[in-house]
Structure formats: structure tokens, C-alpha cells
Amino acid sequence: MFSCLIIGDSTGVGTAHAINQRLEQRCDVLAVERATAAQIMAWPKPTKNYGSCIFAMGSNDPPGERSAEKMMRIRSAMCFRRVIWLLPYGRGQAYTVSSVAARFGDETLDLRCFPTRDGIHPSRYSDVASALLR
């Protein structure tokens, strides 16, 4: 049985909505607008075992080692067979997130591949969902 979790900030909220419109068995969502890595670290850890997880975080955090350390703690506290990180539009934040993903051998999807109006959110989350569900 397929089980997935989407965790993170507003890009996670939008991505989850688009993915769950397409799946019969919906992904669980732990995402809120403007969430930072520090806030996500304080959330209760999921007790369910998920096969896949999409991490959508970093857009609301400054780039750099302190943010990377928080994201590494979040990632270390959870075990999944497959993890995909959404890389934020901001290149500094994207580098920070991608460095964490690389340390764990996780996959990434660069949001910069998708049109945006505000430089933070994709214009069409349906395009992001299509790329993730391939």
C-alpha cells in the first residue's frame, strides 16, 4: 500500500493539494504557510511509517549552515524509503536544501523549473505534482 507524507511550508501546502487531487489514496500533510525549519523541528514526529516523503522547506529560512543543521535534524528524526526535497526559488536557500538532501542521498526537484509570479510559489502546483508523480 502506498503511503506518503508532505511536510513543510506553503510550497508543501500547495503541492499537497495538487497531488491529493490526483491520488485515490491521499498523502498525509504536515505543512503550514510561513513555516520555518525551527518551527517544523518542534512539531510532533509522525508515528506512521511512510514509503515516501516530500520535504518542502527552506523558503522561509536564511541560507546557510544554521538552517542546514535544523533541516538535517528534521531529516535524521524520520525514516522513509524515498525522500524528495523541493528546492526553493531563492538560490541561497536552494543550495542549503540541496546540501542536506545530498548528505542523505535524497532526491530533489528544483522549483525554479516552474514559472512563478512571486519568486516563492509556483504559478501552477499541478505542474509540480505532475513532475513528482512521474
PLM region descriptions:
Residues 2-17:
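Catalytic nucleophile-elbow at a beta strand-turn-alpha helix junction centered on a G-D-S/GDSL motif
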Residues 22, 26-27, 35-134:
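Alpha-helical cap/lid subdomain in secreted, periplasmic
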Residues 32:
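Active-site bordering "gate/hinge" segments
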